[in-house]
């Protein structure tokens, strides 16, 4: 019998991680402009995401420019885009598969073994989704660190981690944790041994010798 509480907890955590991945992908604050080395207070805040770059004025006005040319994008940005989209799509598949395998659902009630397998498969897909999101965010974050400490990068052209990047890391952690809980919610099979059957005792000898 599967642990319904553990299943539900794992599904909720993984689902929240999937929502976080969507939010992280859509947000434009993957990296924000670093003011290291500036001696003046600027009235602008610049930040970039996977799809656009924005400038926020102190008056509250925000101007964004969408990256319209795919060929002008760096390989890191293209790979991050692809991995985040793959992670989100895997999350969609995992949600449907895990929902079928949830003990609280009425699907596959007649086949308990198949129902547990669906829950484990959904958890495994959530693990793959979390891994894709984690690789994407770590790759992009590593690029920010390399450019920040690169002596060839001008001081006024350096960026730091943005809120969307932290959201992506949190989303990956939730997907991995939720997927692991779903995979562990089904108990291992116990080896059953056949019960010994009593054998009939041999008939007692009459004690007579026949010639």
Swiss-Prot record:
One of its GO terms (cellular component) is protein-containing complex. Gene3D superfamilies: 1.20.140.150. It is a multi-pass membrane protein. Keywords: Cell junction, Cell membrane, Disulfide bond, Host cell receptor for virus entry, Host-virus interaction, Ichthyosis, Membrane, Receptor, Tight junction, Transmembrane, Transmembrane helix. GO terms for biological process: bicellular tight junction assembly; calcium-independent cell-cell adhesion via plasma membrane cell-adhesion molecules; cell adhesion; cell junction maintenance; cell-cell junction organization; cellular response to butyrate; cellular response to lead ion; cellular response to transforming growth factor beta stimulus. Disulfide bonds join 54-64. Strongly expressed in liver and kidney. Expressed in heart, brain, spleen, lung and testis. The keyword Nucleotide-binding does not apply. Residues 1-7, 103-115, 185-211 are cytoplasmic. Residues 29-81, 137-163 are extracellular. Changing residue 48 to K: Loss of HCV receptor activity. Significant loss of interaction with CD81. Reduced interaction with OCLN. According to PubMed:17325668 no effect observed on HCV infection susceptibility in cell culture. It is found in: Cell junction, Tight junction; Cell membrane; Basolateral cell membrane. One of its GO terms (molecular function) is identical protein binding. Its main location: other. Residues 210-211 are annotated as: Interactions with TJP1, TJP2, TJP3 and PATJ. The chain crosses the membrane at residues 8-28, 82-102, 116-136, 164-184. Residues 192-211 are annotated as: Disordered. Pfam families: PMP22_Claudin. Belongs to the claudin family. Homopolymers interact with CLDN3, but not CLDN2, homopolymers. Can form homo- and heteropolymers with other claudin family members. Directly interacts with TJP1/ZO-1, TJP2/ZO-2 and TJP3/ZO-3. Interacts with MPDZ and PATJ. Interacts with OCLN, CLDN4, CLDN6 and CLDN9. Interacts with CD81. (Microbial infection) Interacts with hepatitis c virus heterodimer E1/E2. It is linked to Ichthyosis-sclerosing cholangitis neonatal syndrome: A rare autosomal recessive complex ichthyosis syndrome characterized by scalp hypotrichosis, scarring alopecia, mild diffuse ichthyosis, sclerosing cholangitis and leukocyte vacuolization. Claudins function as major constituents of the tight junction complexes that regulate the permeability of epithelia. While some claudin family members play essential roles in the formation of impermeable barriers, others mediate the permeability to ions and small molecules. Often, several claudin family members are coexpressed and interact with each other, and this determines the overall permeability. CLDN1 is required to prevent the paracellular diffusion of small molecules through tight junctions in the epidermis and is required for the normal barrier function of the skin. (Microbial infection) Acts as a co-receptor for hepatitis C virus (HCV) in hepatocytes. Associates with CD81 and the CLDN1-CD81 receptor complex is essential for HCV entry into host cell. Acts as a receptor for dengue virus. This is Claudin-1. It comes from Homo sapiens.
């Amino acid at each position: 019998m599967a642990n319904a509480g553990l299943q539900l907890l794992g599904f909720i955590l993984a689902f929240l991680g999937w929502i976080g991945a969507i939010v992280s992908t859509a947000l434009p604050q993957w990296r924000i402009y670093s003011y290291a080395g500036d001696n003046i207070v600027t009235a602008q805040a610049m930040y970039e995401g996977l799809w656009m770059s924005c400038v926020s004025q102190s008056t509250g006005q925000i101007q964004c420019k969408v990256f319209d040319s795919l060929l002008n994008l760096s390989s890191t940005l293209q790979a991050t885009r692809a991995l985040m989209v793959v992670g989100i799509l895997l999350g969609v598949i995992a949600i449907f598969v895990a929902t079928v395998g949830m003990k609280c659902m009425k699907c596959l009630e007649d086949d308990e073994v198949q129902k547990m397998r669906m829950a484990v498969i959904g958890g495994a897909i959530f693990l793959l989704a979390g891994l894709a999101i984690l690789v994407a965010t770590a790759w992009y974050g590593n690029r920010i660190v390399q450019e920040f400490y690169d002596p060839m990068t001008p001081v006024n052209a350096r960026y730091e981690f943005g809120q969307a990047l932290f959201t992506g890391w949190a989303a990956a952690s939730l997907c991995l944790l939720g997927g692991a809980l779903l995979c562990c919610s089904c108990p291992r099979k116990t080896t059953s041994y056949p019960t010994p059957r009593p054998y009939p005792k041999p008939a007692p000898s009459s004690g007579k010798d026949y010639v």
